[in-house]
Amino acid sequence: MNFTEGCEATGRRPGSAGSRRRRAPRPGPVALLPLLLPLLLPPAAAVPLPAAADSSGEVGLEEEAGARRALLDCEPLARVLRDRAVQLQDEMCKKFTVCENSMEMLVRNNLNLPKVTEEDGCLLAGFDEEKCLTKLSSGLFAFQTYLEFIQETFDSEKQNVESLCYSTKHLAATIRQMVINPDEVVIPDSAAQKSLLANLKSDKDWIEKITMHLILRDFTSFMEKTVRAVRYLKKTRSFSA
């Protein structure tokens, strides 16, 4: 007897001959499973709704809260990265006498380091949020290889530079989350990173030291502009209460 026949048998009137003489076999656990699932699962899991169908606006509020947290986290982290870069520059000046006013700085200044320019929309006059955030995130991702070079070269500060690398990557990813079209953020592929890292290395120790100083100097400048841009965003971006 199949499951349908069992349901029909239990539907006979009590007291009829069929109900006294023939009892429907109890359906096994497998047969009951389709009936029990709606009772076992919470409503949201049983009938998932797309985010767009949420008329309560909770999804939008969650996205806003995430954007607010990301924005609030960016400024202090950017300040820390800027200050660490300044400290590393000071250490290089003390240990290697490679300082800002060294004449050797003119020897190698063709590193093509990321810079924030007027066209990037990060200046207070003509501030363009989407354009600026895209530039900042792309620039921070680009700095990864340069910082990795310092990590491999500046032995006495290897741990500090490693922390700088990790935090820079974290900030780049955080800012990327705030971009409307994150695909516009440029992230160097592994082949480009390996090629750049090889080009940064030199068999002359003093050239590598100058290279490190120039990287830290431009990274400090980039982070200073990042701090200003994020601070301005915090003042101007409006969130729902």
UniProtKB/Swiss-Prot annotation:
GO function term, MF aspect, one: cytokine activity
Disulfide cross-links: 122-132
Region Disordered, residue ranges: 1-25
Signal peptide: 1-46
Pfam name, any one: IL6
Top-level taxon of the source organism: Eukaryota
An individual GO BP term: acute-phase response
SMART domains on file: IL6 (SM00126)
One cellular-component annotation, GO: interleukin-6 receptor complex
PROSITE patterns on file: INTERLEUKIN_6 (PS00254)
Keywords linked to the UniProt accession: Acute phase, Cytokine, Disulfide bond, Growth factor, Secreted, Signal
Entry's localization field: Secreted
Keyword Disulfide bond found: yes
Presence of keyword Secreted: yes
Function: Cytokine with a wide variety of biological functions in immunity, tissue regeneration, and metabolism. Binds to IL6R, then the complex associates to the signaling subunit IL6ST/gp130 to trigger the intracellular IL6-signaling pathway. The interaction with the membrane-bound IL6R and IL6ST stimulates 'classic signaling', whereas the binding of IL6 and soluble IL6R to IL6ST stimulates 'trans-signaling'. Alternatively, 'cluster signaling' occurs when membrane-bound IL6:IL6R complexes on transmitter cells activate IL6ST receptors on neighboring receiver cells.
Family per record: Belongs to the IL-6 superfamily.
Description of how the protein assembles with itself and partners: Component of a hexamer of two molecules each of IL6, IL6R and IL6ST; first binds to IL6R to associate with the signaling subunit IL6ST.
Protein known as: Interleukin-6
Organism (species): Gallus gallus (Chicken)
